[in-house]
């Protein structure tokens, strides 16, 4: 049932300090523009900003009115305008147009742009090109990390995934390095750094440069080991349907900055309610990592216990009643409210999943993971597409089929692609190109074709160049290697084995016992081995780019043995799912350690695939 913390679990660092640092810096920057001012905020910064400095705090520092950046003419009458934005060229061009428009109208105002988490040279170039560089002041708000919960930190950069992995835009690499540098500055140095993936390597290099430039302070480290992993190392995990409670809530209601909006179908009223989902919500904290099949039983027992606590009032004298009202009643009412919401959310999830025939969907996914009944799986996917059930869900199943089968046979690829475009629109043709580029949805390349090309080109060049070309052709023919990886790391339990979801034996419980997430299995294996030794075959199948670096002094490592050595930071570059976080929490309990997840953003199959849709769709 509900998982409980081990008594010997290490204490987590206090991440509220990161919020205070971010708040203090923002206030300092706002005060650089003295007097009343209107503040324009990027839409995707509004929720994170509310967690750092709410409207009351902003008003205390002479912010008069707040507006959302909408890239259209403004209605502000203030003489001072402040813009809090991400470093995006489109937004900077819009600000430049506003300034130039005021110039034409003979209107004098003061303008300040605060870029967060950092400003890029390209943005300053736009200001110069538009002729407004001398009319605005620019600053940086180094808001690298938003603590979402006791063990979840986020850069809140959902665009990181598309920009880095699809567009090849590496501008956010320095942001990742800056986030690690901030953690090291505040919570002490790390003794060991492990990583896998091209982006992970670049983020590590960026962080190392910042360390070499900055002043090194010696202090008691609060956590020691760091593991950096690229999202493209493991695409299977985010493409699987989530079945732990927190993951399901995210899939259906979309959690944003640890907050979710429950509609009338959940609240049993005509109003929607915004709820914070974190460890402060005691009901949620007990069920967040549970497989959904266990949640109703837990909530039912909780409701009975609550009723028993209420029933204590009967037979109380006046003094006892006073004490009950003063000490317990408020807490019971709050628990009752939260319990009602989570029961409502569970019922809503159940209705939606029953309507979607969720069990049949899971059966298909599990067959794909195991490599069984592939023709039946393809027939199910075809039916899914032809019934136009869900554009994203159909795409997800196609990608899962392609990755687990190391690409699709030509006839299957062409047939499924044609059916998809016919059902959802020809405009998705470019989306297929994006998916192919990332290796998510590919047509199998026959070995003969590559061999013929290789031999023909090889005759035209010398041996040295031919060697390089062979490597290039090998990379063209690279496959996801999921089947081999699955066998090597025992990711898929043997078919027919009984799996008790009430008493999970490994991380596979997060996918109903069908699959251990590759990302989390890699972390487990590397920590057990204290490096990549013995995993050479695995890293080769993952196209290399693995590293393990010892940092800090031996005395630092000795100090870590008590608490810090048992707290491990895992940085996901390109996004992390709530299912992976649940798996790492389970692994932490098994190993007697705690994992802190630092991610560029929380993701799921919907967000990941939406990021890869062609921008014109």
Curated annotation (Swiss-Prot):
Protein source organism: Danio rerio
What does the tissue specificity note say?
A: Widely expressed from 4 hours post-fertilization (hpf) to 24 hpf. At 48 hpf, localized to brain, retina, ear, liver and proximal intestine. This expression pattern is more pronounced at 72 hpf and persists through 5 days post-fertilization (dpf). At 3 dpf and 4 dpf, expression in the liver is predominantly in developing biliary epithelial cells. No expression detected in kidney or spinal cord.
The lineage is: Eukaryota, Metazoa, Chordata, Craniata, Vertebrata
Location relative to the cell? Late endosome membrane; Lysosome membrane
**Cellular component terms per the entry's GO annotation:** CORVET complex; late endosome membrane; lysosomal membrane; lysosome
Q: Which PANTHER family match?
A: VESICLE PROTEIN SORTING-ASSOCIATED (PTHR11679)
SUPFAM superfamilies listed in its UniProt record: Sec1/munc18-like (SM) proteins
The UniProt function text for this chain reads: May play a role in vesicle-mediated protein trafficking to lysosomal compartments and in membrane docking/fusion reactions of late endosomes/lysosomes. Required for proper trafficking and targeting of the collagen-modifying enzyme lysyl hydroxylase 3 (LH3) to intracellular collagen. Mediates phagolysosomal fusion in macrophages. Proposed to be involved in endosomal maturation implicating vipas39. In epithelial cells, the vps33b:vipas39 complex may play a role in the apical recycling pathway and in the maintenance of the apical-basolateral polarity. Plays a role in bile duct development.
Which family does the similarity line name?
Answer: Belongs to the STXBP/unc-18/SEC1 family.
Q: Does the keyword Membrane apply?
A: yes
* Assembly description: Interacts with vipas39.
Q: What is this protein called?
A: Vacuolar protein sorting-associated protein 33B
GO annotation, biological process: intracellular protein transport; intrahepatic bile duct development; vesicle-mediated transport
Tell me how this protein sits in the membrane.
Peripheral membrane protein
What keywords were assigned to this record?
A: Developmental protein, Endosome, Lysosome, Membrane, Protein transport, Transport
User: Per the annotation, which location comes first and is thus the protein's main one?
Assistant: membrane
Domain of life the protein comes from? Eukaryota
Annotated Pfam families: Sec1
